[in-house]
Amino acid sequence: MVIGLSHYLTVSAILFTLGVFGIFLNRKNVIVILMSVELILLAVNINMVAFSHFLNDIVGQVFALFILTVAAAEAAIGLAILVVFYRNRGSIAVEDVNMMKG
């Protein structure tokens, strides 16, 4: 059985849909929203690598590595901000994060 482009696009579409549903259905927990954004970025990376492979172009794979780097930094910074916010306020609910002073 040969894994074609349609298989990669199907998996990517499923991951993207799960990420969007995670953002829209869970509006109370910031950690779940961050994980949903990571799922969306993973779906984009799968698309880039799949098209790069099937078009015999390396640029998509290199760009996917840059996206993975930015996604890892975004997750680390986001979780660090949430830890500090939880220590100060005792909650990481979206309603509490929206009321930040700054």
Curated annotation (Swiss-Prot):
A GO BP entry: ATP synthesis coupled electron transport
Assigned GO CC terms: NADH dehydrogenase complex; plasma membrane
Keywords: Cell inner membrane, Cell membrane, Membrane, NAD, Quinone, Translocase, Transmembrane, Transmembrane helix, Transport, Ubiquinone
InterPro entries (UniProt xref): NADH_UbQ_OxRdtase_chain4L/K (IPR001133), NUOK/Mnh_C1-like (IPR039428)
Annotated EC: 7.1.1.-
Keyword Phosphoprotein in annotation: no
Annotated compartments: Cell inner membrane
GO molecular function: NADH:ubiquinone reductase (non-electrogenic) activity; quinone binding
Topological relation to the membrane, as annotated: Multi-pass membrane protein
Enzyme class label: translocase
Highest taxon of source: Bacteria
Pfam families to which the protein is assigned, alphabetical: Oxidored_q2
Gene3D superfamilies (UniProt xref): 1.10.287.3510
Chemical reaction(s) catalysed: a quinone + NADH + 5 H(+)(in) = a quinol + NAD(+) + 4 H(+)(out)
Regions crossing the membrane: 5-25, 31-51, 65-85
Purpose: NDH-1 shuttles electrons from NADH, via FMN and iron-sulfur (Fe-S) centers, to quinones in the respiratory chain. The immediate electron acceptor for the enzyme in this species is believed to be ubiquinone. Couples the redox reaction to proton translocation (for every two electrons transferred, four hydrogen ions are translocated across the cytoplasmic membrane), and thus conserves the redox energy in a proton gradient.
NCBIfam families according to UniProt: PRK05715.1-2, PRK05715.1-3, PRK05715.1-5
HAMAP family, per the entry: NDH1_NuoK
Subunit comment: NDH-1 is composed of 14 different subunits. Subunits NuoA, H, J, K, L, M, N constitute the membrane sector of the complex.
Family recorded in the similarity comment: Belongs to the complex I subunit 4L family.
Name listed for the protein in its UniProt record: NADH-quinone oxidoreductase subunit K 1
